[in-house]
Amino acid sequence: ISWHLALLLGLDLNDKNRVTFNELTETGIKAGMSHPRSIDINLVNAQQARRILDRLVGYKLSPFLWRKIRKGLSAGRVQSVAVKMICDRENEIRAFVSQEYWSIDGKFSANGERKTFAAKLNTVDGEKPELKNKEQADEILKRLEGAEFVIDKVKKSVHRKSPAAPFTTSTLQQEASRRLSFQARRTMKTAQELYEGVEINDMGQTGLITYMRTDSLRISDEARAAAYDFIRKKYGDKYIPDTPKKYKTKGNAQDAHEAIRPTHPEVTPDMVKASGVTSDQYKLYKLIWERFIASQMSNCLMDTVSVDISANGCNFKATGYSVKFDGFTVLYEEAKDDEGEKKNVLPPIKSGDSIKVRNLEENQHFTQPPARYTEATLVKAFEETGIGRPSTYVPTITTIINRNYVERDGKQLKPTSLGEVTNQLMSEHFDKIVDVKF
């Protein structure tokens, strides 16, 4: 855009007539205006190359689809690969053959206590058991009838759990889908509103977040200092890490903008809510704000315990933990921990203590096919494979749904018959173009 404007206005491309803003705040705009630069012609050429590739693919292949299938269809450098990924996953699901397997779980008590804890069969005669049917599970239970269980080993350690990095476009869309059930389009629409600015009490029209189309994990020193100031006042010095948290941006990232973060860390979600913003704006701002503040906090420290229990060559393993210092988890956690592990509170125990088995049971399971993509997992796959850019994730998903190549089934994305026919045709005749690595 800046290159086109410079040409129309007759400006010298070598002059410093380009300004950039990472946030629409007074500070951000003044900083941009005071540090102009010349137009980066390499970025201009990169955009031109992408546009040419898009046209070479789209302009040539779309008419081919019109002739072979029907009018109105389209193909594209990114959208056709996205359809192929979804079709390939569907074929994996169809080809999947579920396998039966069994597990053996025990309830134990130590030192005469009535309270029990859980342990799972881990090895049999030093090998991982493969119990493929009930008969094999029954053999293990028979082998353990009347057996004397002993505690072989108790291992204690401290586990350090680090906070998640601040959001990129991809991770924001994924987490908003998981936590808020927002589709990617809804997330980006709301993020755009927060970036452009909303009315905040005593602040007027204020841009609340930095630019929301980014693949960078970098944050400014000023933002980190503001986060520390809030953390210190709210939680105390022990919640500030000894060394600043710095997150490594992926190698294929452009790193043109900071990570997505609040422009004013001191503006809490409650303050934003009190200003009368929409429900979506409040929810998304709260998610972005909590994630950013937590990313700059101390690690969570957990005391972990692992207990090995054996009888007749069968080894059971119990694991559990307790929180020693909550750290960043006082504010935010990316995903729920294993609830079963949380509830498995182990008693004070050491090697050689008496142990009694209270119950042994066998449980049947079946292996599960790979899950269909959701918007969140598809965006994650885009990022991991380098397909598209943060600015194209939502348009790509919107296009393949609007073209009726893909449809929603709850949160899942599945190919339509039209999508599968189109993908098969593209894969047979233009396999390199629909290759993920193209």
Where do the PLM segments sit?
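Short, intrinsically disordered, charge-balanced linker/junction segments flanking boundaries
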Residues: 432-438
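Flexible beta-alpha connector loops of hexameric P-loop NTPases
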Residues: 179, 385-386
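Toprim catalytic domain recognition across nucleic-acid enzymes
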Residues: 1-380, 392-396, 401-405, 410-413, ...
